[in-house]
Amino acid sequence: MKFNNKVAIVTGGGRDIGRQVSLKLAAEGAKVVVNYANDAASAEETLRLIEAAGGTAVLHRADVTTPEGVDGLVSAAQAAFGPGVDILVNTAGGMVARKPLLEIDDAFYDSVMDVNFRSTFLTTRAVVPHMSSGAAIVNFASQAGRDGGGPGASLYAVSKAAVMTFTRAMAKELGPKGIRVNALCCGMISTRFHDDFTKPEVRQAVANGTPLRREGRPEEAADVAVFLASDAAGFMTGANVDVNGGTYFS
């Protein structure tokens, strides 16, 4: 197994892409800390699926937009599996809402930046002291971070562009310590994110505009994340990998 006895923390790991990442890491032998914020039922189902397949995992509820939350998450990982962390996958994030510029107030700005960038920054800062050479960090950016996003998604796009730049900066800073840092820039993936924030006709138009003529599946994004966390990607760092069905070739 490629992750045998390695310790992995997955933020937002209870549902959608995060669930698939948690399942796939556990299936390859990792001991997984599945973090979630609010949806306990989905997180518990993720744990059930991992254990039913013979994997090892624990759940930990934490708000990873706060220092206290991420410190508690790291403490929970250490209590369950020991002092070291080998893999961090930052999947926590979200749109919050679609708003044009003149409807964005300070509170909304903070909420979007917190859930998408601050969470990634804080969790990385808390986990890195417990990583050693050979560890890997995988962040979730977005296609929106490259192209500015769709209507009402400007702030979301900015927050994900920050994740992309943070990924490159951390790759430079942590590379001499043997820690790799990469990110995924996902396009249209079939998750609750688009169920909540994208109209069906827009989803269909976006899917039709890709060479593959469909949305991506959560497990397809998770496969890329797991690859980036593995030794198979041992000479990859600082990459923002497009997982978008070939959008830019359309």
What label would you give each PLM region?
Residues S142:
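Residue(s) in the substrate-gating loop at a strand-loop-helix junction
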Residues T210-A221, A232:
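A conserved structural motif in NAD(P)-dependent oxidoreductases
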Residues K99-L101, D105-M113, H194, V206:
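Substrate-binding pocket helix/loop in short-chain dehydrogenase/reductase
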